[in-house]
Amino acid sequence: MPITNALSVDVEDYFQTEAMAAAAPRNSWGSFPSHVEANTRSLFELFAKYDIRATFFFLGWVAERYPRLVSEARQLGHEIGCHSYWHRPVFHLSPTEFREDTSRAKQVIEDAAGVAVAGYRAPCFSINSSVGWAHGILEELGFQYDSSSNPVRHAFYGDHRGHRRPFPVSEGLHELPIATWRILGQNLPVGGGAYLRIMPYWLVKSGLSSINRTESRPGILYLHPWEIDEAQPRLEVSLISRARQYTRLSQMKEKLERLLRQFKFGTVYETVYLPLVNKNNRAPDCLATPAPLRRSSAC
C-alpha cells in the first residue's frame, strides 16, 4: 500500500517573503495589492481535484484580514496551522518577541478557524540550535508539533547536521522536519518550495520515492500560494532576491500537479504526527471535522 505523504502550504502573500523584505517593509504591507485569496483558493480547487487534504500554515497577518479564507480551508477538511504573525525569522527575535508574535498569531488563526491549532512552522525554517528556547515557548502555548526544521545547507536557514526524521523535543512537542533525500553523504532538499520550482521534477520524485520506499516513512512537502502565481507584481529587489522569488514560477503548478497524481498526500497532523504518538492513528474530533474551538489536552 502506498505511503501517504504530508502536503503543507505556508499561507503568505508575495510581498511578505524575506526575498521581498527590502522592497516591502512590514509597515507597508497594506499598500500592496493582495493575491493571497485568489492563489490560495486556486490551491483549494487543485487539491479538491485529487481529493487531497493538506495543512495550511496561515500567517496571522493574513488570517486577521481574511478570516473567511481560514474558515474555508477548515470547512474543506484541511488542517489549520500557524506560520507566525509578522513573518519574522525566529533567530532575529528575543524570547519575549517570539512569544508575543506567536501567541497573537495563534489566537487570530484559531478565532478564524473555530478549532485549536496543533502545528507551527517558523518563517524561513528559522528554529535551529541557536534558538532552542523557542520549542519551550511553543509547548507552553499549546502546540503539539513544530515543522520548522529543514536539514539542508542554505545561506540563510537550515542545519545540514540536523535530524532528518521526526523526533520528540519534549514529552509534549515533536519536531517534524521537511523532506530531504540522503544521497552521496548529503541531504538533498526535495521537500518543495523553490527546490520544486528549480530542480528537475525527476529528482524530486526520486527523492520522495526513496524516502517512502527505503525509509518506509512519509515525507513532508511545502509550498506557498504565490509560487503558482506567475502574474504576481515584480518588485524592485536585488538580483539574488529576484532569482529566489521569480525563478520558474511558470513551472510550479504543473510540477505540483504531477506530484499529486503520482503520490498520496494528507495533512501533517494525520500522516506524520499522529503515528508518532497514537498507535490507534485516530485524530481528535476537533481536527477530524469542523468543530467549535475547544482548548483541551488533545488539541
Protein language model features and the residues they cover:
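Catalytic alpha-helical scaffold of carbohydrate-active enzymes acting on polysaccharides/glycoconjugates
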Residues: M1-G119, C124-L184, L203-C299
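Surface-exposed cleft-lining segments at the edges of enzyme active sites
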Residues: L188-I198
